């Protein structure tokens, strides 16, 4: 099992080829973000990820994945993680507990907790 120090590599290994995670792009650290605008401007067709916040205290990435896609079991050594499900459904595993989450759910994972996600259902999450 691995830590996720290199987020670009983690996402590529998990099948997310369309990503914008490098520091300094136009969507990062702005006060207002529109997800549909990002999708239209970047013309991402399948799974994608865009970092929208990154500083010493917090990081935020918008991710869209198709059913069956997800990530491998991993942990974050230096930070807690918070997810807001905007659409679709995920199967979440945190340590030994597995649950299904859907649109409107918020998930919090403490630092050093093993976790993984898989998009499930019949539409992207």
List PLM regions with ranges.
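Structural motif
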Residues: 89-91, 98, 114, 124
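A short hydrophobic beta-strand segment most commonly corresponding to one strand
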Residues: 62, 108, 122-125
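Short acidic-glycine-tyrosine-enriched beta hairpin
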Residues: 96-112
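A short, N-terminal "cap"/entry segment at the start of jelly-roll beta-barrel domains
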Residues: 1-59, 72
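Short, conserved beta-strand element in jelly-roll/cupin
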Residues: 63-66, 75-93
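Short beta-strand His + acidic residue motifs that chelate non-heme Fe in jelly-roll/DSBH
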Residues: 72-73, 92-93, 109, 115-121
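Short histidine-centered beta-strand/loop micro-motifs
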Residues: 50-54, 62-64, 71-77, 118-120
């Amino acid at each position: 099992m691995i830590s996720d120090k290199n987020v670009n590599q983690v996402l590529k290994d998990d099948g997310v080829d369309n990503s914008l995670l490098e520091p300094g792009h136009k969507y990062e650290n702005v006060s207002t973000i529109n997800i549909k605008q990002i999708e239209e401007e970047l013309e991402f067709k399948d799974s994608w990820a865009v970092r929208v916040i990154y500083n010493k205290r917090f990081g935020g990435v918008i991710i869209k994945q198709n059913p069956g896609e997800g990530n491998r079991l991993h942990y974050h050594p230096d930070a807690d993680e918070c997810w807001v499900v905007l659409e679709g459904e995920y199967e979440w595993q945190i340590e030994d507990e597995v649950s299904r989450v859907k649109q409107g759910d918020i998930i919090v994972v403490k630092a050093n907790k093993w976790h993984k996600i898989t998009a499930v259902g019949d539409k992207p999450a």
